[in-house]
Amino acid sequence: MAQVAVVSASHWTQAYLGLPYIMGVGECAHRAALVWRQEFGFEVEPPPAHGDMTVAQRHIEAELAKPEWCRVRRPMEGDAVVMWKGNRVCHVGVWVAPGHVLHCTRKDGMVLTPVEDLEPQGFRVFGYFRWQEQVAMAA
């Protein structure tokens, strides 16, 4: 897996790198929710804690349909990066400038991946989404 040192040892992402993937309670959406709460100050409800991937996928789709989220063309630090396989949302991470995604995989736990390396790993970017308070900050 391509990992590039794009941030300093004191960058906020360092606190999350290596956190393990834990089925049902430490999956991608749970870890993204943790980052949004601790680093960006907003609460996103993670999927129920039972490890059912179909339920988790539906939860991510339902969360993004809420009015608090706005789809954007150009991501900024903290935006949701939503990925899919086939025609279903399957994965979510957090945009980290410049051009990286902090996300949690079953194999590696929390990692920082260049956006161009996501698709070769099976994650096609579906879109970028911004929480409403972040929209106001970006304006």
Enumerate the language-model features and the residues they cover.
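Conserved short-loop catalytic and cofactor-binding motifs
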Residues: 19-20, 66
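Short glycine/serine/threonine-biased micro-segments
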Residues: 16, 39, 91
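...with weaker cross-activation on analogous glycine-rich loops/strands in unrelated enzymes
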Residues: 48-110, 116
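Active-site nucleophilic cysteine motif
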Residues: 20-40
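A structural boundary/capping signal
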Residues: 42-43, 47
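Short amphipathic alpha-helical patches
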Residues: 35-40, 55-63, 116, 125-131
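Non-catalytic ligand/cofactor/substrate-binding and regulatory segments of enzyme domains
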Residues: 1-17, 115-139
